[in-house]
Amino acid sequence: MSVSQVTDASFKQEVINNDLPVLVDFWAPWCGPCRMVSPVVDAIAEEYESSIKVVKINTDDNPTIAAEYGIRSIPTLMIFKSGERVDTVIGAVPKSTLESTLNKYIS
């Protein structure tokens, strides 16, 4: 399963109403650390494809959702389960950090 892009308009359908846990990568094209973490997010999407959904949302193009969730710095990675935000990881973190955070929410 590849990483899909979501927008302010599709966020509820793709993230909130999803049966699987969802990892949301809040990013922007000009953000260097976002580009550093992008391959990690892509690898997570491949390795966990049967357990989670992974999406990215460009905060420049979709400011409503970014503001709603209080995004102050990017990259910010949020985990949603059953429509609720359950965890947040801020910054370009190692894959192991992201995996250990995700594993808490995968049954």
UniProtKB/Swiss-Prot annotation:
Pfam families: Thioredoxin. Disulfide bonds join C31-C34. Gene3D superfamilies: Glutaredoxin (3.40.30.10). The record marks D25 as: Deprotonates C-terminal active site Cys. The keyword Nucleotide-binding does not apply. The active site is at C31 (nucleophile), C34 (nucleophile). GO terms for cellular component: chloroplast. InterPro entries: Thioredoxin (IPR005746), Thioredoxin-like_sf (IPR036249), Thioredoxin_CS (IPR017937), Thioredoxin_domain (IPR013766). Keywords: Chloroplast, Disulfide bond, Electron transport, Plastid, Redox-active center, Transport. Belongs to the thioredoxin family. This is Thioredoxin. It comes from Porphyra purpurea.
